[in-house]
């Protein structure tokens, strides 16, 4: 598994290779074979660093998607359990009954208010 320490090491290694390449270029000249060889080494290190960073990102995305899939499965199972059983229908019937009683109470209160206001 790619850790943050490994990424940090590769980043530092990449910077060191770049600095060494610049040093050789300044000391020996741009066209010296050692400079060309160092550029190749620096490019290889840059490639390794990019590969590790991509791998780390891909693993993080995989972990997130796995967690989300697990959560979705749990929610689906819970929803199926509620819909399959009589609990859903009982709850729905209870809510309808409560709604009817509230409507009756509202009508009674309004009728009582009208009768009070109509009495002189």
UniProtKB/Swiss-Prot annotation:
Family: Belongs to the herpesviridae UL96 family.
Full protein name: Protein GP96
Organism: Guinea pig cytomegalovirus (strain 22122)
């Amino acid at each position: 598994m790619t850790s943050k320490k490994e990424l940090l090491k590769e980043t530092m290694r990449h910077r060191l290779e770049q600095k060494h390449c610049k040093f050789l270029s300044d000391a020996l000249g741009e066209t010296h074979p050692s400079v060309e060889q160092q550029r190749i080494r620096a490019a290889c290190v840059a490639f390794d660093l990019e590969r590790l960073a991509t791998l780390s990102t891909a693993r993080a995305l995989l972990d997130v998607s796995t967690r989300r899939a697990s959560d979705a499965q749990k929610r689906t199972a819970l929803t199926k359990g509620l819909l399959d059983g009589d609990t859903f229908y009982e709850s729905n019937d209870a809510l309808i009954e409560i709604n009817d009683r509230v409507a009756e109470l509202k009508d009674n209160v309004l009728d009582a208010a009208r009768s009070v206001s109509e009495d002189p």
